[in-house]
């Protein structure tokens, strides 16, 4: 379910390690206080533990929170290590993360913006 989660308008990841003993209330408080974001929006917030083999997702679904949890049996997520930072992911970066790849792919084509017809 977490690999193909498409219900959210935005996806944020909390860089660095998060204490995954936190539940819904603790993670929602972290989103509000540390990152100054609103957890009551159509947004998926992702958190990773120290060993990088487990992630938790927090998602508000109009009438309550959903807490998603995934533990890899082998391998680890390529999680950004910079502490106390939150990053917005594109859908492509989210797929890369769920596939075990780094969210910054140096060989990927970058989107082109600001073009005009000749």
Model-derived regions: residue spans:
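Polybasic/polar functional segments that serve as interface/processing modules
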Residues: 1-118
